[in-house]
Protein backbone atom coordinates (compact mmCIF):
# COMPACT_ATOMS: atom_id res chain seq x y z
CA UNK A 1 0.00 0.00 0.00
CA UNK A 2 1.31 3.47 -0.93
CA UNK A 3 1.99 5.59 2.14
CA UNK A 4 1.93 9.40 2.24
CA UNK A 5 3.51 11.66 4.86
CA UNK A 6 1.96 15.09 5.42
CA UNK A 7 3.57 18.07 7.14
CA UNK A 8 2.91 21.77 7.65
CA UNK A 9 2.04 23.99 10.58
CA UNK A 10 2.43 27.12 12.63
CA UNK A 11 -0.82 28.70 11.40
CA UNK A 12 -4.28 27.48 10.39
CA UNK A 13 -3.43 28.19 6.75
CA UNK A 14 -0.50 25.80 6.88
CA UNK A 15 -2.80 22.95 7.92
CA UNK A 16 -6.12 23.49 6.14
CA UNK A 17 -5.10 22.10 2.73
CA UNK A 18 -3.78 18.98 4.47
CA UNK A 19 -7.10 18.64 6.28
CA UNK A 20 -8.79 18.66 2.88
CA UNK A 21 -6.43 16.19 1.21
CA UNK A 22 -5.95 13.58 3.94
CA UNK A 23 -9.59 12.33 3.81
CA UNK A 24 -9.21 11.99 0.03
CA UNK A 25 -6.05 9.93 0.51
CA UNK A 26 -7.87 7.65 2.93
CA UNK A 27 -10.89 7.33 0.60
CA UNK A 28 -8.51 6.31 -2.21
CA UNK A 29 -6.98 3.60 -0.03
CA UNK A 30 -3.68 5.25 0.88
CA UNK A 31 -2.01 5.02 4.28
CA UNK A 32 -1.20 8.41 5.84
CA UNK A 33 0.50 10.00 8.82
CA UNK A 34 1.40 13.53 9.94
CA UNK A 35 4.62 15.17 11.11
CA UNK A 36 4.32 18.43 13.04
CA UNK A 37 5.56 20.30 16.07
CA UNK A 38 4.92 19.20 19.62
CA UNK A 39 2.65 22.06 20.68
CA UNK A 40 1.68 23.77 17.42
CA UNK A 41 -1.81 24.50 16.15
CA UNK A 42 -1.34 21.71 13.59
CA UNK A 43 -1.32 19.11 16.35
CA UNK A 44 -4.55 20.47 17.83
CA UNK A 45 -6.26 20.58 14.42
CA UNK A 46 -5.13 17.16 13.21
CA UNK A 47 -5.87 15.35 16.47
CA UNK A 48 -9.30 16.98 16.87
CA UNK A 49 -10.49 16.76 13.26
CA UNK A 50 -8.69 13.61 12.09
CA UNK A 51 -8.21 11.61 15.30
CA UNK A 52 -7.45 8.36 13.46
CA UNK A 53 -4.33 9.84 11.82
CA UNK A 54 -1.01 8.97 13.45
CA UNK A 55 0.75 12.18 14.55
CA UNK A 56 4.54 12.38 15.04
CA UNK A 57 6.01 15.45 16.75
CA UNK A 58 9.50 16.79 16.04
CA UNK A 59 11.71 19.64 17.25
CA UNK A 60 11.25 22.84 15.25
CA UNK A 61 12.74 26.33 15.28
CA UNK A 62 11.21 29.54 13.99
CA UNK A 63 12.56 30.97 10.75
CA UNK A 64 13.15 34.72 10.93
CA UNK A 65 13.98 37.28 8.26
CA UNK A 66 15.64 39.60 10.78
CA UNK A 67 18.80 39.40 12.90
CA UNK A 68 18.20 37.88 16.33
CA UNK A 69 20.17 35.81 18.83
CA UNK A 70 17.21 33.44 18.78
CA UNK A 71 18.22 32.50 15.24
CA UNK A 72 21.38 30.88 16.63
CA UNK A 73 19.41 28.79 19.12
CA UNK A 74 16.83 27.84 16.55
CA UNK A 75 19.47 26.56 14.12
CA UNK A 76 20.10 23.77 16.60
CA UNK A 77 16.35 23.15 16.96
CA UNK A 78 16.04 22.80 13.19
CA UNK A 79 19.02 20.43 13.06
CA UNK A 80 17.44 18.32 15.80
CA UNK A 81 14.19 18.47 13.85
CA UNK A 82 15.95 17.01 10.80
CA UNK A 83 17.20 14.11 12.93
CA UNK A 84 13.75 13.64 14.50
CA UNK A 85 12.10 13.67 11.07
CA UNK A 86 14.65 11.22 9.63
CA UNK A 87 13.88 8.83 12.47
CA UNK A 88 10.13 9.05 11.81
CA UNK A 89 10.51 8.70 8.05
CA UNK A 90 12.87 5.72 8.33
CA UNK A 91 10.36 4.03 10.62
CA UNK A 92 7.22 4.83 8.58
CA UNK A 93 8.83 4.46 5.11
CA UNK A 94 6.44 6.74 3.15
CA UNK A 95 6.48 6.76 -0.64
CA UNK A 96 6.14 10.54 -0.78
CA UNK A 97 5.86 13.69 1.35
CA UNK A 98 3.34 16.52 0.90
CA UNK A 99 4.37 19.73 2.65
CA UNK A 100 2.09 22.71 3.22
CA UNK A 101 4.86 24.95 4.53
CA UNK A 102 5.43 26.74 7.82
CA UNK A 103 8.56 26.56 9.94
CA UNK A 104 7.97 22.97 11.08
CA UNK A 105 8.04 21.69 7.49
CA UNK A 106 11.65 22.61 6.67
CA UNK A 107 13.42 19.87 8.69
CA UNK A 108 10.90 17.30 7.39
CA UNK A 109 11.56 18.22 3.75
CA UNK A 110 15.34 18.14 4.30
CA UNK A 111 15.07 14.75 6.00
CA UNK A 112 12.92 13.40 3.16
CA UNK A 113 15.48 14.51 0.58
CA UNK A 114 18.27 12.77 2.53
CA UNK A 115 16.24 9.56 2.36
CA UNK A 116 15.35 10.03 -1.34
CA UNK A 117 11.64 10.45 -0.57
CA UNK A 118 10.04 12.67 -3.27
CA UNK A 119 8.42 15.83 -1.91
CA UNK A 120 5.66 18.08 -3.24
CA UNK A 121 5.23 21.45 -1.52
CA UNK A 122 2.30 23.86 -1.66
CA UNK A 123 2.32 27.67 -1.44
CA UNK A 124 -0.96 29.43 -0.65
CA UNK A 125 0.16 33.06 -0.63
CA UNK A 126 0.89 35.34 -3.57
CA UNK A 127 4.59 35.53 -2.66
CA UNK A 128 6.43 32.43 -1.39
CA UNK A 129 7.13 32.17 2.34
CA UNK A 130 10.63 31.70 3.72
CA UNK A 131 10.00 28.07 4.71
CA UNK A 132 8.92 27.13 1.19
CA UNK A 133 11.80 29.06 -0.37
CA UNK A 134 14.20 26.91 1.64
CA UNK A 135 12.22 23.71 1.08
CA UNK A 136 12.06 24.25 -2.69
CA UNK A 137 15.76 23.35 -2.98
CA UNK A 138 14.93 19.85 -1.69
CA UNK A 139 11.53 19.32 -3.36
CA UNK A 140 10.45 17.88 -6.67
CA UNK A 141 7.57 20.30 -7.29
CA UNK A 142 5.88 23.34 -5.78
CA UNK A 143 2.17 24.06 -6.35
CA UNK A 144 0.74 27.58 -6.18
CA UNK A 145 -2.68 28.94 -5.30
CA UNK A 146 -2.16 32.23 -7.18
CA UNK A 147 -1.18 32.05 -10.85
CA UNK A 148 1.00 35.16 -10.44
CA UNK A 149 3.13 33.29 -7.88
CA UNK A 150 4.73 31.44 -10.81
CA UNK A 151 6.65 34.65 -11.54
CA UNK A 152 8.65 34.14 -8.33
CA UNK A 153 9.53 30.48 -8.89
CA UNK A 154 11.61 28.31 -11.25
CA UNK A 155 9.49 27.31 -14.24
CA UNK A 156 10.58 23.68 -14.21
CA UNK A 157 9.42 23.14 -10.62
CA UNK A 158 6.29 25.29 -10.27
CA UNK A 159 2.69 24.47 -11.23
CA UNK A 160 -0.42 26.60 -10.70
CA UNK A 161 -3.22 24.51 -9.15
CA UNK A 162 -5.51 27.18 -7.68
CA UNK A 163 -7.21 27.05 -4.30
CA UNK A 164 -8.33 23.88 -2.57
CA UNK A 165 -11.33 24.61 -0.37
CA UNK A 166 -13.02 22.35 2.15
CA UNK A 167 -15.60 19.89 0.84
CA UNK A 168 -18.10 20.97 3.51
CA UNK A 169 -17.76 24.69 2.74
CA UNK A 170 -20.94 24.91 0.69
CA UNK A 171 -23.00 22.66 2.95
CA UNK A 172 -23.82 25.37 5.50
CA UNK A 173 -27.42 25.44 6.73
CA UNK A 174 -29.06 28.88 6.62
CA UNK A 175 -31.81 27.83 9.02
CA UNK A 176 -29.19 26.67 11.50
CA UNK A 177 -27.25 29.92 11.00
CA UNK A 178 -30.28 32.02 11.85
CA UNK A 179 -30.98 29.80 14.86
CA UNK A 180 -27.43 30.21 16.20
CA UNK A 181 -27.55 33.99 15.90
CA UNK A 182 -31.27 34.62 16.49
CA UNK A 183 -31.11 36.87 13.42
CA UNK A 184 -33.68 37.00 10.61
CA UNK A 185 -33.50 37.16 6.83
CA UNK A 186 -35.02 40.64 6.54
CA UNK A 187 -31.66 42.39 6.97
CA UNK A 188 -28.15 41.80 5.62
CA UNK A 189 -25.60 39.96 7.79
CA UNK A 190 -22.03 41.23 8.28
CA UNK A 191 -19.46 38.71 9.51
CA UNK A 192 -16.37 40.18 11.19
CA UNK A 193 -13.33 37.90 11.54
CA UNK A 194 -10.11 39.24 13.05
CA UNK A 195 -8.22 35.96 12.82
CA UNK A 196 -7.71 33.28 15.47
CA UNK A 197 -5.85 35.73 17.73
CA UNK A 198 -8.28 38.55 17.03
CA UNK A 199 -7.54 42.24 16.48
CA UNK A 200 -8.15 44.67 19.33
CA UNK A 201 -8.11 47.64 16.96
CA UNK A 202 -10.70 46.08 14.65
CA UNK A 203 -12.83 44.93 17.60
CA UNK A 204 -12.82 48.43 19.09
CA UNK A 205 -13.80 50.12 15.82
CA UNK A 206 -16.62 47.63 15.18
CA UNK A 207 -18.06 48.21 18.64
CA UNK A 208 -17.65 51.98 18.47
CA UNK A 209 -19.57 52.02 15.18
CA UNK A 210 -22.08 49.33 16.02
CA UNK A 211 -25.13 51.59 15.85
CA UNK A 212 -24.13 52.82 12.39
CA UNK A 213 -23.39 49.30 11.17
CA UNK A 214 -26.74 48.11 12.50
CA UNK A 215 -28.53 50.52 10.18
CA UNK A 216 -27.50 48.16 7.36
CA UNK A 217 -26.46 44.90 8.99
CA UNK A 218 -26.97 42.31 11.65
CA UNK A 219 -23.41 41.73 12.91
CA UNK A 220 -21.66 38.44 13.73
CA UNK A 221 -18.40 39.30 15.48
CA UNK A 222 -15.65 36.69 15.88
CA UNK A 223 -13.46 38.56 18.36
CA UNK A 224 -10.54 36.19 18.94
CA UNK A 225 -9.62 34.37 22.12
CA UNK A 226 -10.16 36.34 25.32
CA UNK A 227 -11.58 39.40 23.53
CA UNK A 228 -15.32 39.08 24.20
CA UNK A 229 -17.00 42.11 25.77
CA UNK A 230 -19.79 40.99 28.09
CA UNK A 231 -21.34 44.45 28.15
CA UNK A 232 -22.66 43.73 24.64
CA UNK A 233 -24.40 40.47 25.54
CA UNK A 234 -28.06 40.70 24.52
CA UNK A 235 -27.51 43.62 22.12
CA UNK A 236 -30.03 43.52 19.28
CA UNK A 237 -28.65 42.55 15.85
CA UNK A 238 -25.22 41.75 17.33
CA UNK A 239 -23.68 38.49 18.51
CA UNK A 240 -20.08 37.77 19.42
CA UNK A 241 -18.04 34.58 19.62
CA UNK A 242 -14.38 34.13 20.47
CA UNK A 243 -13.95 31.54 17.74
CA UNK A 244 -16.27 29.28 15.75
CA UNK A 245 -15.22 25.94 14.28
CA UNK A 246 -18.00 23.42 13.68
CA UNK A 247 -20.74 26.01 13.03
CA UNK A 248 -18.75 28.36 10.78
CA UNK A 249 -20.24 27.00 7.55
CA UNK A 250 -23.74 27.73 8.90
CA UNK A 251 -22.74 31.31 9.75
CA UNK A 252 -21.16 31.75 6.30
CA UNK A 253 -24.42 30.54 4.74
CA UNK A 254 -26.25 33.62 6.07
CA UNK A 255 -23.38 36.10 5.52
CA UNK A 256 -23.79 38.85 2.92
CA UNK A 257 -20.53 40.74 3.53
CA UNK A 258 -17.39 39.81 5.44
CA UNK A 259 -14.66 41.84 7.13
CA UNK A 260 -11.60 39.66 7.49
CA UNK A 261 -7.86 39.26 7.64
CA UNK A 262 -6.36 38.27 4.28
CA UNK A 263 -5.00 34.78 4.79
CA UNK A 264 -5.12 32.98 1.45
CA UNK A 265 -7.27 30.03 2.52
CA UNK A 266 -9.93 32.22 4.13
CA UNK A 267 -10.27 34.67 1.26
CA UNK A 268 -10.52 31.90 -1.33
CA UNK A 269 -13.34 30.40 0.73
CA UNK A 270 -15.19 33.74 0.64
CA UNK A 271 -14.56 33.84 -3.11
CA UNK A 272 -15.95 30.33 -3.58
CA UNK A 273 -19.07 31.39 -1.65
CA UNK A 274 -19.35 34.69 -3.59
CA UNK A 275 -19.26 36.80 -0.41
CA UNK A 276 -18.01 40.37 -1.04
CA UNK A 277 -15.13 41.10 1.32
CA UNK A 278 -13.48 44.00 3.09
CA UNK A 279 -9.95 42.81 3.85
CA UNK A 280 -7.79 44.18 6.66
CA UNK A 281 -4.47 42.34 6.27
CA UNK A 282 -1.89 41.84 8.99
CA UNK A 283 0.62 44.69 8.86
CA UNK A 284 4.37 44.52 8.35
CA UNK A 285 4.85 44.75 12.11
CA UNK A 286 3.07 41.38 12.48
CA UNK A 287 3.98 39.49 9.28
CA UNK A 288 6.21 39.45 6.21
CA UNK A 289 3.54 41.31 4.25
CA UNK A 290 2.00 38.27 2.56
CA UNK A 291 -1.54 39.22 3.60
CA UNK A 292 -1.08 42.72 2.18
CA UNK A 293 -0.09 41.18 -1.16
CA UNK A 294 -3.05 38.78 -1.04
CA UNK A 295 -5.51 41.57 -0.23
CA UNK A 296 -4.27 43.94 -2.93
CA UNK A 297 -4.40 41.14 -5.49
CA UNK A 298 -8.01 40.32 -4.61
CA UNK A 299 -8.96 44.00 -4.71
CA UNK A 300 -7.35 44.34 -8.16
CA UNK A 301 -9.54 41.46 -9.35
CA UNK A 302 -12.67 43.27 -8.16
CA UNK A 303 -13.53 40.81 -5.37
CA UNK A 304 -13.75 43.43 -2.61
CA UNK A 305 -11.94 46.27 -0.87
CA UNK A 306 -8.84 46.60 1.31
CA UNK A 307 -7.94 48.77 4.30
CA UNK A 308 -4.40 48.60 5.68
CA UNK A 309 -4.46 48.27 9.45
CA UNK A 310 -2.44 51.46 10.04
CA UNK A 311 -5.05 53.42 8.05
CA UNK A 312 -8.07 51.72 9.67
CA UNK A 313 -10.36 54.46 10.98
CA UNK A 314 -14.08 54.75 11.63
CA UNK A 315 -14.52 56.91 8.54
CA UNK A 316 -12.52 54.57 6.28
CA UNK A 317 -14.49 51.56 7.51
CA UNK A 318 -17.81 53.24 6.71
CA UNK A 319 -16.57 54.46 3.32
CA UNK A 320 -15.35 51.07 2.14
CA UNK A 321 -18.44 49.20 3.36
CA UNK A 322 -20.59 51.75 1.55
CA UNK A 323 -18.55 51.13 -1.63
CA UNK A 324 -19.10 47.39 -1.30
CA UNK A 325 -22.86 47.74 -0.87
CA UNK A 326 -23.12 50.20 -3.77
CA UNK A 327 -21.19 47.83 -6.06
CA UNK A 328 -22.40 44.53 -4.58
CA UNK A 329 -23.87 43.15 -7.82
CA UNK A 330 -20.73 43.99 -9.80
CA UNK A 331 -18.47 42.38 -7.17
CA UNK A 332 -20.50 39.17 -7.15
CA UNK A 333 -20.56 39.14 -10.96
CA UNK A 334 -16.78 39.45 -10.99
CA UNK A 335 -16.47 36.65 -8.43
CA UNK A 336 -18.53 34.39 -10.66
CA UNK A 337 -15.78 34.58 -13.32
CA UNK A 338 -13.45 32.66 -10.97
CA UNK A 339 -13.33 28.92 -11.56
CA UNK A 340 -11.63 26.39 -9.30
CA UNK A 341 -8.68 24.87 -11.19
CA UNK A 342 -8.59 21.45 -9.53
CA UNK A 343 -11.09 19.47 -7.55
CA UNK A 344 -9.78 17.94 -4.36
CA UNK A 345 -9.61 14.54 -6.07
CA UNK A 346 -7.84 15.95 -9.14
CA UNK A 347 -5.24 17.70 -7.00
CA UNK A 348 -4.60 14.56 -5.00
CA UNK A 349 -4.09 12.54 -8.18
CA UNK A 350 -1.69 15.17 -9.50
CA UNK A 351 0.34 14.93 -6.27
CA UNK A 352 0.62 11.16 -6.69
CA UNK A 353 1.54 11.38 -10.39
CA UNK A 354 4.11 14.16 -9.97
CA UNK A 355 5.76 12.65 -6.90
CA UNK A 356 6.07 9.10 -8.19
CA UNK A 357 6.90 9.80 -11.85
CA UNK A 358 10.49 9.30 -12.97
From Swiss-Prot:
It catalyses: Mur2Ac(oyl-L-Ala-gamma-D-Glu-L-Lys-D-Ala-D-Ala)-di-trans,octa-cis-undecaprenyl diphosphate + UDP-N-acetyl-alpha-D-glucosamine = beta-D-GlcNAc-(1->4)-Mur2Ac(oyl-L-Ala-gamma-D-Glu-L-Lys-D-Ala-D-Ala)-di-trans,octa-cis-undecaprenyl diphosphate + UDP + H(+). Its main location: membrane. Pathway: Cell wall biogenesis; peptidoglycan biosynthesis. Keywords: Cell cycle, Cell division, Cell membrane, Cell shape, Cell wall biogenesis/degradation, Glycosyltransferase, Membrane, Peptidoglycan synthesis, Transferase. It is found in: Cell membrane. It holds the Pfam family Glyco_transf_28. UDP-N-acetyl-alpha-D-glucosamine binds at residues 166, 196, 291. InterPro entries: GlcNAc_MurG, Glyco_trans_28_C, GlycoTrans_28_N. Cell wall formation. Catalyzes the transfer of a GlcNAc subunit on undecaprenyl-pyrophosphoryl-MurNAc-pentapeptide (lipid intermediate I) to form undecaprenyl-pyrophosphoryl-MurNAc-(pentapeptide)GlcNAc (lipid intermediate II). HAMAP family: MurG. This is UDP-N-acetylglucosamine--N-acetylmuramyl-(pentapeptide) pyrophosphoryl-undecaprenol N-acetylglucosamine transferase. The lineage of its organism: Bacteria, Bacillati, Bacillota, Bacilli, Bacillales. The gene is murG.
Amino acid sequence: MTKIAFTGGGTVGHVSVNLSLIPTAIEEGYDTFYIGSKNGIEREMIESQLPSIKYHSISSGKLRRYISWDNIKDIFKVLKGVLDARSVLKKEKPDLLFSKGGFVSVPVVIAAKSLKIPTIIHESDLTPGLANKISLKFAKKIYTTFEDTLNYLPKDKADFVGATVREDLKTGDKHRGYQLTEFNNDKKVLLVMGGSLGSKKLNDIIRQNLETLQETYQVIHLTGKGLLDNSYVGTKDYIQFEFVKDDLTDLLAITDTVISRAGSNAIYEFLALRIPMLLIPLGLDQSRGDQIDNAKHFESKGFGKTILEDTLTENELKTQLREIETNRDDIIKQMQTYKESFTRQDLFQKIINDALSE
